[in-house]
């Protein structure tokens, strides 16, 4: 017997269609094709050949046996199995999406780091390829340089010996180059002693030098022999120096080439060092990125494990359904019936005993019910009923009404210079508006709680925007409050200005009285003008001190507005007539110059005549 598994309303149902012909007046309606024997199951015998049917055309309608006369309907057994649906937790799904995005970013970052690392390693290998021949070339120049140095060493030693024999040591006298030179020096010292008149101390010194020169005779002879030997083997001193110069020139060329190669090697070595440093940095970065990626992998694995744990009953139910299908294919009705009864009893016991199980199952079938336009209890949904799962609104359109109204309802930020408290009626208006907003929010929260879907949280729905009339009324109230605040500020400023003007007038009157008293006292005592000049800076100091005292209470307040001052200039001291001094008249010197010139001319004329 075939068992068909069909999905219906969260259950696995095996429908039982009736394939026999309906009865008419208590009898079966027999027709053509009903005379074939009916077997259990959906598979029957194959039809006979067309030739045999043509031979038996006459007796085709006549029944032959009871099975053909009374056909038995095809029997189909129906078994009901509970079906568990998979459930995707939105929190776990969001975490998985976020973890997948993070893993994708880390994979991209890792591939980028790997590409950079490959490029740097290729650059390092290129630098190694350039450095290896240069190092081998420098090694060849080093060997050449060492060979030339070895060739020059005997010549330099010979020159050193020749030079060391010429000069003497710091302690003793100079060693002569030959025995003839030594004899001539000794003879010159002896000649001085014999033929020159010198003091005794100098004579003793000369005798001492002669003895020292005689002591160097053996060395002079040995040096002369060695010099002769060197000349025989290597030639004269000039020839040796020429050879050394030639070899030194070749050595300098080798040295320059070696220095150029060394500079190139140093440059490449610096580049190689920088490349190695970059490679180490990239390797560390790759290590950190790999660690982060491994953590992301482990996080995704944990989240998937949590998701599978929540759907463990779904996987168990799937194995049960597969087993039922296998039993149905095998036509093992007894075991299939036992399995169905056991599963149903298990489900009913869990449904009646555990609340969490009921909530979880209802949560799992909500999507199926909603897709089939059914309500929570399985009946057809009415047109006015809301869907079980609210559709997610677009992020651009899902802006709440508060975000549209609150910025308009907020008053403009007042400047810091005017922190004047608003009057009481304005405060009450603001409180009323705040209370109204709170009431609206509480109402919205209550509505959200009522509309919450069991097992899925609150459905997302758009809040109703505030009407234009209410927004206009709120703006009007705000403008009235602002106007009242401005009037209060103006009144306070006017009162402050009047008080300051009264204080200033009183101080000026006191100053005038003091000045008049001082003038009267000076007239009586006959004071000098110096005292009068000293009074002017004192008055100016008092004028400066007065505004400072007035500004002190202003500093305590935040309001800083420059008050309008009506300064009245105080009368200064009476002007005294200046004393007119008699000045001497400037003498004109040209008046004396003319007679002086005449006198000089007369004297010259008289002298001229006197000489003649």
From Swiss-Prot:
Topological category with respect to the lipid bilayer: Single-pass membrane protein
Stretches the record annotates as Disordered: 1-58, 374-572
Modification sites for Phosphoserine: 540
Compositional bias (Acidic residues): 531-545
Keyword DNA damage in annotation: no
Segments passing through the bilayer: 591-611
Keyword Magnesium annotated: no
Keyword list, A-Z: Cell membrane, Coiled coil, Endoplasmic reticulum, Membrane, Phosphoprotein, Transmembrane, Transmembrane helix
Origin superkingdom: Eukaryota
Biased composition (Basic and acidic residues): 20-35, 374-387, 434-446, 459-498, 505-519, 549-564
Coiled coil location: 90-113, 251-314, 466-526
Summary of the tissues where the protein is detected: Strongly expressed in root and shoot vascular systems, particularly in meristematic and sink tissues. Also present in pollen, stigmas and siliques, but not in developing embryos.
Single GO BP term: regulation of proton transport
Quaternary context: Interacts with AHA1 via N-terminal region.
Main function: Promotes AHA1 plasma membrane ATPase activity by binding to a site different from the 14-3-3 binding site.
Family named by the database record: Belongs to the plant Proton pump-interactor protein family.
UniProt protein name: Proton pump-interactor 1
UniProt organism field: Arabidopsis thaliana (Mouse-ear cress)
Lineage: Eukaryota, Viridiplantae, Streptophyta, Embryophyta, Tracheophyta
The gene coding this protein: PPI1
């Amino acid at each position: 017997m075939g068992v068909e598994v069909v999905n219906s309303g969260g259950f696995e149902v095996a429908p039982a269609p009736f394939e026999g012909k309906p009865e008419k007046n208590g009898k079966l309606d027999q027709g053509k094709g009903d005379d074939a024997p009916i077997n259990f199951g959906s598979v029957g015998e194959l039809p006979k050949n067309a030739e045999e049917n043509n031979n038996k055309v006459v007796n085709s309608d006549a029944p032959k046996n009871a099975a053909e006369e009374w056909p038995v309907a095809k029997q189909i057994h129906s078994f009901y199995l509970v079906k568990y649906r998979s459930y995707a937790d939105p929190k776990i799904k969001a975490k998985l999406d976020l973890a997948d995005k993070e893993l994708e970013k880390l994979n991209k970052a890792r591939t980028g780091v790997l590409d950079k690392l490959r490029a740097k390693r290729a650059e390092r290998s290129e630098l190694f390829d350039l450095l290896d021949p240069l190092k081998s070339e420098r090694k060849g120049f080093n060997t050449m340089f060492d060979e030339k140095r070895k060739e020059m060493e005997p010549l330099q030693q010979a020159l050193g010996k020749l030079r060391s024999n010429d000069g003497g040591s710091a302690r003793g006298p100079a060693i002569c180059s030959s025995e003839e030179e030594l004899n001539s020096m000794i003879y010159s010292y002896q000649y001085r002693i014999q033929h020159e008149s010198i003091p005794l101390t100098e004579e003793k010194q000369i005798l001492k030098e002669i003895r020292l020169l005689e002591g160097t005779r053996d060395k002079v002879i040995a040096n002369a022999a060695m010099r002769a030997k060197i000349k025989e083997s290597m030639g004269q001193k000039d020839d040796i120096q020429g050879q050394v110069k030639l070899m030194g020139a070749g050595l300098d060329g080798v040295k320059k080439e070696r220095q150029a190669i060394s500079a190139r090697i140093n440059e490449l070595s610096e580049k190689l060092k920088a490349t190695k440093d970059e490679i180490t940095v990239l390797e560390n970065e790759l290590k950190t990125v790999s660690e982060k990626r491994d953590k992301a992998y482990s996080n995704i694995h944990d989240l998937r494990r949590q998701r599978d744990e929540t759907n463990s009953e779904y996987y168990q139910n799937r194995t049960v359904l597969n087993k039922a299908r296998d039993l149905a294919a095998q036509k093992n009705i007894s075991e299939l019936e036992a399995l169905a009864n056991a599963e149903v009893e298990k489900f009913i016991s869990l449904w009646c005993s555990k609340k969490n199980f009921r909530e979880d199952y209802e949560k799992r079938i909500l999507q199926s019910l909603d897709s089939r336009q059914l309500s929570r209890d399985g009946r057809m949904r009415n047109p006015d009923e809301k869907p079980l799962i609210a559709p997610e609104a677009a992020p651009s359109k899902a802006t709440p009404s508060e975000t549209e109204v609150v910025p308009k309802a907020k008053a403009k930020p007042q400047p810091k210079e005017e922190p004047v408290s608003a009057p009481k009626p304005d405060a009450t208006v603001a409180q009323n508006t705040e209370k109204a907003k709170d009431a609206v929010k509480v109402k919205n929260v209550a509505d959200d709680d009522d509309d919450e879907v069991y097992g899925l949280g609150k459905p997302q729905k758009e809040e109703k925007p505030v009407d234009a009339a209410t927004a206009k009324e709120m703006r009007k109230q705000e403008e009235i409050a602002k106007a009242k605040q401005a009037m209060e500020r103006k009144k306070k400023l006017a009162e402050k200005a009047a008080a300051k003007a009264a204080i200033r007038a009183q101080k000026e009157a006191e100053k005038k009285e003091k000045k008049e008293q001082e003038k009267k006292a000076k007239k009586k005592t006959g004071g000098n003008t110096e005292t009068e000049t000293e009074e002017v800076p004192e008055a100016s100091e008092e004028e400066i001190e007065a505004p400072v005292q007035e500004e002190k209470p202003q500093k305590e307040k935040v309001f800083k507005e420059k008050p309008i001052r009506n300064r009245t200039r105080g009368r200064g001291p009476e002007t005294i007539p200046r004393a007119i001094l008699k000045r001497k008249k400037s003498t004109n010197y040209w008046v004396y110059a003319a007679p002086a010139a005449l006198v000089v001319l007369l004297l010259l004329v008289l002298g001229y005549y006197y000489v003649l």
